[in-house]
Amino acid sequence: MSIGLFENVGNSLQFAFDNTAKKLLRWIGLSVVFYVPILQFLAIGIFMKVYRGEEPDFSNAGKSFIQGLLLFIAQLVYALIPCLIIILSALFSASESLGAITVVGLIVGIVLAVILGFIMIPMQVNFARKQSFGAAFDFNTIFGMIGKLGLAKFILAWLLYVLVIFAASIVIGLFSAIPVVGAVILMLYGSFCGLFAAKYFHNLFE
């Protein structure tokens, strides 16, 4: 990809701004569904449209809702294995004779959770672009995406993304103390971050 990491941040922030502050009604609508249980799947589906290079609007809302729901299910499947390992390890911790197994199990579970957390990013991009549930588990393509980008660049891009979100959260947190205004800003912040993240990783794996 020709675009650099820092340029990607600027490009993605501009994209999020253009599709929120410049399209206020869409921003409000997206923010509402983003925080409403069940309807949140629609917001996820709209973010997925960005992975495909589409406009993040409410057209084909039914399709976006289904795709958001399917992505949520895929994420649950990814999270299931490390969670089970950690839970079983915690249960075994009551037995002194299984102390070593418990420690190993916890370490394995945590490491696996971190690895799958990284994999989930290209998984979401692949799922959104192919619009197929099976694409979420097409590990040849998913690992190929990481390999094409380069593991080091992928990790750096992820760290930069986390840093940007962390910095933005601190700034937003300062405004959250303002009555009413703070609550509105917090509500709008989630959907803005969703659009930023979708565009950022769309560019990364373009």
Regions found by a protein language model. Name each.
Residues 3-33, 60-84, 119-169, 197-206:
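Interfacial aromatic "cap" segments that immediately flank transmembrane helices
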Residues 85-93, 163-167, 180-183:
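Short alpha-helical linear motifs
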